[in-house]
UniProtKB/Swiss-Prot annotation:
Keywords: Cytoplasm, GTP-binding, Hydrolase, Magnesium, Metal-binding, Nucleotide-binding, Potassium, tRNA processing. Signal peptide: none annotated. (6S)-5-formyl-5,6,7,8-tetrahydrofolate binds at R24, E81, K121, K457. Its EC number is 3.6.-.-. This is tRNA modification GTPase MnmE. NCBIfam families: mnmE_trmE_thdF, PRK05291.1-3, small_GTP. It holds the Pfam family TrmE_N.
C-alpha cells in the first residue's frame, strides 16, 4: 500500500505531560481504529466518553472520542480524535494500540495538512499561512498569517485565474473559428480590456505589498563597537534578561549572540557581537570577523561609541549602506549627561562621516534606553512598511505575480502580431497563478513546506 493511502496518527496537542492530549487519526482505517480501541464509532461530530482498550482488551484510559466522516473533515478523509489524559504512559499505550492496526502508521511532519491540501480543503497559499501562523512570534505576525490562512491571497488569485481563463477562451475561440465567421470580429477587444485590467490589479497588489515579506522574516539589529563599550549590557537591557555574559574585561564576547524581541508587535533579532579591534588572539580574531560580517548584513547597526578608542564605525564595518546609529554609552561614568555634549562633535571624528541618529545612554542604569527603544519602534514602523496588511507575504508569491504581470504586459504588446502569440502569454499567466495556488508543478515546494511543520499538523 502506498504511504499516502495508509492511515496516519499523531499527537496534535502540546508535549506531555499535560492535562489533556489530542491524538488525531486520518485515513480509511480511522473508523476501524475507533471500533477496535473505543468499541464503536460515535455519532458524527459528537463527543463521547469511553474507556479505551488495546487490542488485547487491557484498559488504556478513560477518554473522549470524536468522529468526523470524510470528506467533511479537516483533511477530507475520515478523521478520529482521541482526547486522553496527557501523560507519556497513556500516550505510549495509545500509540502502541494504533500501530498494531493494519495500515495505520505514525504521521510524518505536516502530513495532515498535506492531505488537506491534496484533498482540496486548502490551497497552497493557505497552507503557507498555516505554517506562518504556527511559527508566528508576535501579534502582528499572527494577524498577517491568519489573513493568509483565511484565503486573502488565495481568493484573489482564484478570481484572477478564472477571469484569465475566460479571456483566454475568447481569444482561442477567435483563433479556432475565425475562418467560419462564428465569432464577431471585435472578440479580441473585450478580452484584452479584461487582460489590461487584471494586469493593473496584479501590479497594484504588488505595489501595495512592497516589502511585505519583512514582517514574516523579521528585522535584524546588530550592536557593534570596540571591546568593553557595553554592548552585552545593552543587549541584556533591551532583552530584559541576562542573555549575554557581562564582564569588566575587554573581549569577553567572542561569538555572536542572538536575542529575539517583540518590539510593539514587530519581530526583531538583536545581535551582540564581539568587540571590534586588532588582536593577535586567533579565537578573538574569528569573533571580530563574524562581528564585521553580521554588522554588514544587518538591517540596522547600533554603534556603541567609546571616547577612549579612535576607531570609527566606517573603519570597521565598511560602507555597505546599512543604516547606522551612534550610541554613546556610559554617560553615568563619562559625564556626558551633564557636560552639554554637542552631537555635531561626534560627527566630525575622522572616518565617521555624517551619522543620522545619536543617542546618549547608560546601559547599566537604563538612562536614555527608553528613548532608544522608542526610536527603534519608529524605525520599525517605516522599515516593515505595509507588511501587516499585505496580501503578499512570501518572496515566492512576489516572484510568481511579477512574472504573471510581465506575461500579461507582453500579451498586450503582441496585439496585432498574431493572436496565437497573445494566447500563449495568457496561458503562461494562467499556469503561473495556478502554481501560486499549488495546482501545478509544485512537488518540490510541498516537500520543503510541509517538512517544516510539526508532527501532528
Amino acid at each position: 500500500m502506498h504511504p499516502r493511502e495508509q492511515t496516519i496518527f499523531a499527537l496534535s496537542s502540546g508535549r506531555p505531560p499535560s492535562a489533556i492530549a489530542v491524538v488525531r487519526v486520518s485515513g480509511a482505517e480511522a473508523g476501524t481504529a475507533l471500533q477496535e480501541i473505543a468499541g464503536a464509532i460515535p455519532v458524527v461530530r459528537t463527543a463521547k466518553r469511553v474507556l479505551l482498550r488495546d487490542l488485547l482488551g487491557e484498559a488504556i484510559d478513560d477518554a473522549i472520542v470524536l468522529w468526523f466522516a470524510g470528506p467533511a473533515s479537516a483533511t477530507g478523509e475520515d478523521v478520529a480524535e482521541f482526547h486522553v489524559h496527557g501523560s507519556r504512559a497513556v500516550l505510549n499505550a495509545l500509540f502502541a494500540a494504533l500501530s498494531s492496526i493494519d495500515h495505520v502508521r505514525p504521521a510524518e511532519p505536516g502530513e495532515f495538512t498535506r492531505r488537506a491540501f491534496e484533498n482540496g480543503k486548502i490551497d497552497l497559499t493557505e497552507a503557507e499561512g498555516l505554517d506562518d501562523l504556527i511559527h508566528a512570534d508576535t501579534d502582528r505576525q499572527r494577524r498577517q498569517a491568519l489573513r493568509q490562512l483565511q484565503g486573502l491571497l488565495g481568493d484573489r488569485a482564484r478570481e484572477w485565474r478564472r477571469e484569465l481563463i475566460e479571456a483566454s477562451a475568447l481569444i482561442e475561440a477567435g483563433i479556432d473559428f475565425a475562418d467560419e465567421g462564428d465569432v464577431p470580429d471585435d472578440l479580441l477587444k473585450p478580452a484584452m480590456e479584461k487582460i489590461a485590467r487584471l494586469r493593473r490589479e496584479i501590479e497594484e497588489t504588488l505595489a501595495a505589498s512592497a516589502q511585505s515579506e519583512r514582517l514574516r522574516d523579521g528585522m535584524t539589529v546588530a550592536i557593534a563597537g570596540p571591546p568593553n563599550a557595553g554592548k552585552s549590557t545593552l543587549l541584556n537591557r533591551l532583552a530584559r534578561r541576562e542573555a549575554a555574559i557581562v564582564s569588566p574585561y575587554a573581549g569577553t564576547t567572542r561569538d555572536v549572540i542572538e536575542v529575539h524581541l517583540d518590539l510593539d508587535g514587530y519581530p526583531v533579532t538583536l545581535i551582540d557581537t564581539a568587540g571590534i579591534r586588532e588582536t593577535d588572539d586567533p579565537v578573538e580574531q574569528e569573533g571580530v570577523r563574524r562581528a564585521r560580517d553580521r554588522a554588514a548584513s544587518a538591517d540596522l547597526v547600533l554603534w556603541l561609541a567609546d571616547d577612549d578608542n579612535g576607531v570609527g564605525p566606517s573603519q570597521t564595518i565598511g560602507e555597505g549602506g546599512v543604516p547606522l546609529w551612534l550610541v554613546r554609552n556610559k554617560i553615568d561614568v563619562s559625564g556626558a549627561e551633564s557636560d552639554g555634549a554637542n552631537p555635531r562633535q561626534l560627527e566630525a571624528k575622522p572616518g565617521q562621516g555624517i551619522l543620522p541618529r545619536h543617542f546618549w545612554i547608560s546601559a547599566s542604569r537604563g538612562d536614555g534606553v527608553d528613548e532608544l527603544v522608542a526610536a527603534l519602534t519608529a524605525f520599525s514602523d517605516g522599515w516593515f512598511g505595509s507588511g501587516e496588511t499585505a496580501v503578499i507575504t512570501r518572496l515566492r508569491h512576489r516572484n510568481i505575480l511579477q512574472d504573471a504581470a510581465a506575461s500579461l504586459a507582453k500579451a498586450e504588446a503582441l496585439i496585432g502580431q498574431g493572436d496565437e502569440l497573445v494566447a500563449e502569454e495568457i496561458r503562461i499567466a494562467v499556469r503561473l497563478i495556478g502554481r501560486l495556488l499549488g495546482r501545478v508543478d509544485i512537488d518540490d515546494i510541498l516537500d520543503s513546506l510541509f517538512h517544516d511543520f510539526c508532527i501532528g499538523k
